[in-house]
């Protein structure tokens, strides 16, 4: 039986930043701790933006609220946010992770149920979102991240530069 994913870890593509990460590994523990604290506040800001978008989601708002309650920041050198997991339960017993992908990307309109099965006409998730690149656009997590991305990048570079300048000055 195939495994199903029940969470998303959102972090930047680090393929272009391998040299930077190696330099960050050379810093002492105090400088790394300072960087992780700065980046954690950025991750918390990002998680708060995603969570607010979930609570404001107009289509299937109860599902989105269950998923939004699971958004949490991670303490790392790069901005990282976790969404989903086993917490939160819907009335049918599904946890937030099981609702995550259907609520974010939608579902096919011919899948599961009939017009008499559910109050909403037989559909468990909103209509599938349009294609974009290798996947779908999403309803609230990925559009929110896309809008926040320039500010996240700017704040992360500022935090890294500030910590590296302090480390270079005092080491």
Where are these regions (language model features)?
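Charged, low-complexity interaction tracts
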Residues: 2-14, 53-171
């Amino acid at each position: 039986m195939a495994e199903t994913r029940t969470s998303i870890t959102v972090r930047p593509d680090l393929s272009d930043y391998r040299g930077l990460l190696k330099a960050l590994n050379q810093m002492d523990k105090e400088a790394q701790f300072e960087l992780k604290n700065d980046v954690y506040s950025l991750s918390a800001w990002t998680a708060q933006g995603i969570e607010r978008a979930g609570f404001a989601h107009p289509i299937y708002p109860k599902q989105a609220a269950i998923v939004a309650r699971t958004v949490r920041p991670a303490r790392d050198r790069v901005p990282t946010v976790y969404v989903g997991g086993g917490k939160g339960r819907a009335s049918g017993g599904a946890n937030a992770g099981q609702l995550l992908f259907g609520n974010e990307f939608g579902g096919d309109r011919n899948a599961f149920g009939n017009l008499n099965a559910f109050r909403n006409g037989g559909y468990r998730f909103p209509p599938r979102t349009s294609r974009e690149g290798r996947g779908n656009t999403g309803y609230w997590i990925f559009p929110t991240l896309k809008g926040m991305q320039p500010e996240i990048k700017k704040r992360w570079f500022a935090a890294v530069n500030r910590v590296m300048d302090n480390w270079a000055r005092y080491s």
